[in-house]
Amino acid sequence: MNQLDQLKRLTTVVADTGNFLQLAQFAPQDATTNPSLILKAVQQAEYAPLLTETVARHRGLPLDQVVDQVLVRFGLEILKIVPGRVSTEVDARLSFDTAATVARAHRIINLYDDAGIGRERVLIKIASTWEGIQAAAELEREGIHCNLTLLFAFAQAVACGAAGVQLISPFVGRIYDWYKKSAGANWDEAAMAGANDPGVKSVAQIYSYYKKFGIATEVMGASFRNVGQITALAGCDLLTISPDLLAQLQASEEPISAALDAAAARDAAIDAVRYDEPGFRFALNEDAMATEKLAEGIRAFAADAAKLDKMILAL
């Protein structure tokens, strides 16, 4: 049995791509998108007609509404292939505006509803800022489920769990990138692999905390750099994986066993933590990696959103 099929026995496998034509070969349960992945997809020849057609159909609407139409169109195509959920992201430029994030989420979910897609098949993706987490809490109370992304710090995970969000996406690879760059010539790749990888350790800590205290929020490891990071998190609730790494898993017959164990986590010696807004902001500020990576991630998604805007305006 290949590694992908083995992994599916332990974890819900999610495809991290806007390239929906690649999905069927991997048979994932869910799929995730973000502004960068959608931008990458629309720059490929096979998706150009979809972009052109969607923009033409909604010409005359304000730009931000046309963008949401494009994002949802990709989501609808993905949902024709995956049996589960798709994550569609709110504009990263709204990451510090709770009310605007809620309003944009309403618009996205209404577009899916107009297309006959139930709320249970859509996750609204929001950056894990304090403002984003408050928006998600409000949306969850309305029955609109959220995926809190750009999550790098334990404090972000604790706040998301307390807010009752459906799912979080802790970023394994970007955490790994930061520590590797910080260590420079002193980085020992072999010693820092697998369970010792700082990104893997972050997800494992969050997973254990949630299971210990019965927090229902799903943990979906994201942003992987290599197969070793994925197999080191086998047993996590979900893992969202790029097509390149899905293909590598599919090509390997190496055995995989569960690395995370909910029952063991429930017996772990962990103390409960709570954060109000000042405490959250201070904890995040104390974590240089998380502070830098959250800011960098928002900037990158905002820049790609602006590039997509320009592409649409040029049509």
Swiss-Prot record:
Coiled coil spans: none
Catalytically driven reaction(s): D-sedoheptulose 7-phosphate + D-glyceraldehyde 3-phosphate = D-erythrose 4-phosphate + beta-D-fructose 6-phosphate
Record key words, sorted: Cytoplasm, Pentose shunt, Schiff base, Transferase
E.C. numbers: 2.2.1.2
Gene3D superfamilies for the chain: Aldolase class I
Pfam families on file: TAL_FSA
Subcellular location: Cytoplasm
Active site per UniProt: 125
Example GO BP: pentose-phosphate shunt
GO cellular component: cytoplasm
GO molecular function terms noted in the UniProt entry: transaldolase activity
Keyword RNA-binding: no
Physiological role: Transaldolase is important for the balance of metabolites in the pentose-phosphate pathway.
Family under the similarity heading: Belongs to the transaldolase family. Type 1 subfamily.
Subunit and partners: Homodimer.
UniProt-recorded name of the protein: Transaldolase
